């Protein structure tokens, strides 16, 4: 059975020592370390630092398969504004000059790959940002050249990062998500094409942001079977009837009952995890199933505990025989 891990990004208010203790109590087999809080600090990731992290997890019998640096990755391609100051450390945001922020973020993503190699993991999950997300809705009219320029900008900024990852034996797994260069199947295909199929680029598969958009989240697994480097298990619910705030959210906050969609604890939303597991089996995905737990209406300790149990219950190994072969005996 695949290991069930907990993504620590939503738990950065807790020390890594405390979270290790709790993750064991919740029922997890390992952690996916976020590169914020004290969970994994890229700028401090010397050999000794990485060894101490490995020893801490080993003390709690927790495995480690990946690290995640979504916040820094977001700044590599984004049009930088005051929002980024809230998610970036001062050494990356600096004076806020947009190109300077993007360059420092790119250098930090290279450093993240180097730190991952020292830590002994071969996957870095994260975001890419996008210079063209604001062009999502084609009015005022958006020309094809404007979109092409956005993908070209993405490739120019990320190819040097990915070249470094390839040399290190590390892969970058983009979490396909609104505000990124890829947010559905069509844009994911275009991102791969823009990178000339770079072998170090793939996906941290997360069905939640695909489902409420109306994207075939099971087909995503088959379409990119050789580029599913990591899997996030996250559920989302969306309404079967019209709501006051639609897919775009109506500038409401998560948890607002007027919303069309919202994150749910695993097993309590609309995502069909049965079909996801079957698809992962068919492509022979052997990596971790990492819970990214979000549900604004539920206590997180309760939710993270039930999520670990849910994933272990829904996962199953593929068959190694044809069930009807016995009919021939």
Predicted feature residues:
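Active-site-proximal loop/turn and secondary-structure-junction residues that shape catalytic pockets
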Residues: 10-12, 35-37, 70-73, 128-132, ...
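Hydrophobic faces of well-ordered beta-strands that scaffold small-molecule active sites
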Residues: 2-8, 31-33, 64-69, 124-126, ...
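Short amphipathic alpha-helices and their capping/turn segments at secondary-structure boundaries
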Residues: 17-24, 44-65, 108-123, 216-229, ...
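C-terminal helical cap(s) of enzyme catalytic domains, especially alpha/beta-barrels
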Residues: 300-320, 327
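Active-site acidic/histidine proton-transfer and metal-coordination neighborhood
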Residues: 13, 17-18, 22, 59, ...
